[in-house]
UniProtKB/Swiss-Prot annotation:
Signal peptide as annotated in the record: none
Keyword DNA damage: no
Localisation: Nucleus, Nucleolus
Quaternary structure and interacting proteins, as annotated: Component of the U3 snoRNP particle. Binds to the C'/D and B/C motifs in U3 snoRNA. Component of the 25S U4/U6.U5 tri-snRNP particle, a subcomplex of the spliceosome. Binds to the 5' stem-loop of U4 snRNA.
Name the record gives this protein: 13 kDa ribonucleoprotein-associated protein
Matching Gene3D superfamilies: 3.30.1330.30
Swiss-Prot/TrEMBL GO biological process terms: mRNA processing; RNA splicing; rRNA processing
UniProt main location, coarse: nucleus
Role, per record: Common component of the spliceosome and rRNA processing machinery. In association with the spliceosomal U4/U6.U5 tri-snRNP particle, required for splicing of pre-mRNA. In association with box C/D snoRNPs, required for processing of pre-ribosomal RNA (rRNA) and site-specific 2'-O-methylation of substrate RNAs. Essential for the accumulation and stability of U4 snRNA, U6 snRNA, and box C/D snoRNAs.
Entry similarity comment: Belongs to the eukaryotic ribosomal protein eL8 family.
Keywords, ordered alphabetically: mRNA processing, mRNA splicing, Nucleus, Ribonucleoprotein, Ribosome biogenesis, RNA-binding, rRNA processing, Spliceosome
One of the record's GO cellular component terms: nucleolus
Gene Ontology MF, one: RNA binding
Length: 126
């Protein structure tokens, strides 16, 4: 695995990455997950995104650097995880995934876990 790109900020550490990927996997099972940079952009534009997860080892990284700008406009937290392969596995697909979006659902069973991870991501951005 190549070293993460320095443009990938904020980068989650190993424990936070694992928590994020666990929530991504649960959200995928609950149909609360959108996979890919294009779908993540759509959720941001529609205002239904809780937070955005991006892969730091994406090559070239510029194909998803529009997302942090959009996140800051929409006031949505975002984070980079080290591996696109791990993000793809957590999303439940056999291919690498460079970006994912957890969507809003007030009746969700994993709402508390989503908010806990969201708070940790927000502290990274400060």
């Amino acid at each position: 695995m190549s070293a993460p790109n320095p443009k990938a900020f904020p980068l989650a550490d190993a424990t936070l990455s694992q928590q994020i990927l666990d929530v991504v996997q649960q959200a995928s099972n609950m149909r609360q997950l959108k996979k890919g940079a294009n779908e993540a952009t759509k959720t941001l534009n529609r205002g239904i995104s809780e937070f955005i997860i991006m892969a730091a080892d994406c090559e070239p990284i510029e194909i998803l650097l529009h997302l942090p700008l959009l996140c800051e406009d929409k006031n949505v937290p975002y984070v980079f995880v080290p591996s696109r392969t791990a993000l793809g596995r957590a999303c439940g697909v056999s291919r690498p995934v460079i970006a994912a979006s957890i969507t809003t659902n007030d009746a969700s069973a994993i709402k508390s876990q989503i908010y806990a991870v969201k708070d940790k991501i927000e502290t990274l951005l400060i």
